[in-house]
A protein has these predicted regions:
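Short amphipathic alpha-helical segments
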Residues: 17-40, 75-78
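Glycine-rich beta-strand-turn "strand-cap" elements at beta-sheet edges
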Residues: 1-5, 36-54, 77-102
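Residue-level signal for secondary-structure boundary sites
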Residues: 19-21, 63-65, 99
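Surface-exposed beta-strand edges and their flanking turn/coil or helix-capping segments
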Residues: 23-26, 36, 56-58, 67-70, ...
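Short, well-ordered beta-strand segments in beta-rich or mixed alpha/beta enzyme
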Residues: 6-14, 42-71
Length: 102
């Protein structure tokens, strides 16, 4: 990781069927994560509720993260019914403040 500040776009939402969402949604990468500045991502599932997922996408800059968040919102409005979403996912922007690996 460089010393430059990085931005993280964190998305949380419930999915009706994780495997279907992962295969037909996330893995297909319809927006093009790399082409829009995503440097890395993590997909997380809740231990208490496996249908709850969180995705963390890391960017070099806040403007890149904001632009990608808007593309996600546009896509969600189009595909929400297919994945059984009762409400659209929520996207929040964060600045990476500290990282330590052990």
């Amino acid at each position: 990781m460089t010393n430059e500040p990085r931005s993280v776009l964190r998305v949380e939402h419930a999915v009706a069927d994780y495997e279907t969402w992962k295969r037909e949604g996330f893995d297909r990468d319809p927006i093009g994560r790399a082409e829009h500045g995503v440097r890395s991502f993590r997909v997380l599932r809740s231990g208490q509720n496996p249908a709850l997922v969180a995705i963390e996408l890391e960017f070099d800059s806040l403007p890149a993260a904001e632009a990608f968040a808007e593309k996600l919102r546009e896509m969600w409005r189009e595909v929400g019914d297919r994945f059984g979403w009762r409400e659209l996912p929520e996207a929040r922007l964060f600045e990476l403040a500290a990282v330590q690996e052990y």
